Amino acid sequence: MKPVLKYPGSKWRIAGEIVARIPEHHTYLEPFFGSGAVFFSKEPSRIEMINDLDNNVPNLFRCIRDDPDRLARIVATTPYSRHEYERAFTSNEEQDNFQRAADFLTTCWQGHGFRTNGYRVGWKNDVHGRESMYALRNWYNLPEVILETAERLRCVQIDNRPALEIIKRFNYPDVFMYIDPPYILGTRKAKQYKHEMTDADHEELLGVLKNSEAMVMISGYESELYDSMLKGWHKEQFRSNAEYGGNRVETVWMNYERQFTIKDFQQEKLF
């Protein structure tokens, strides 16, 4: 499935690596949803809950689920232009939810890089077609992607609560939680999100997850804080591409042993 949202820290390029490490489960929870790369790359679970504290995210996916044709029409009639990009930043919660969702897509797809903290990174355009060619193509293909995304969201619960509230509610052994919080600020170059997390916030999150009965996988960059608080957890690393930082090493911590398959051993022989 193609991405419907460009979002900082999205996992589209490494979603396959993460999905391969998801154990069998009954209920799926993703409390820091963002663009939902892992969710859209895996098979549906019996029960699924997606959540994000940034109200633009759940508003977008509710609009896609509830009336994809309406949102697709708004996007289809929104030109790829500097004026639309600048205007979209004036969007607010008093506006129609569907127009607000379209404005959110505009700021994320038509800008250089992607931020959700209100910072304007500049309208993406190019004289030689190096960037504008694929940027324009992606924008004008977006209505079709919206319609495809809607089908996957049909039976999904969508919430807009602090992550810890949701995590505590889903504290059951047959639940799998994929935790992809804003990474520790010391491991990246700049603030990117509307709702960032301090080191104290990360400590509180890890404290709750350590005591959870659910199966948990956490994504992050190499971190002494995470290593010290998650002693005894299974840890794996693989290469990923950061937005501006080139190649980075992605780390996942799991409170369960990974279930290897024949495919894993076949891939190992290739290297």
Give the residues covered by each predicted segment.
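Class I S-adenosyl-L-methionine
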Residues: 1-49, 53, 164-176, 183-271
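Generic alpha-helical structural signal
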Residues: 62, 143, 203-206
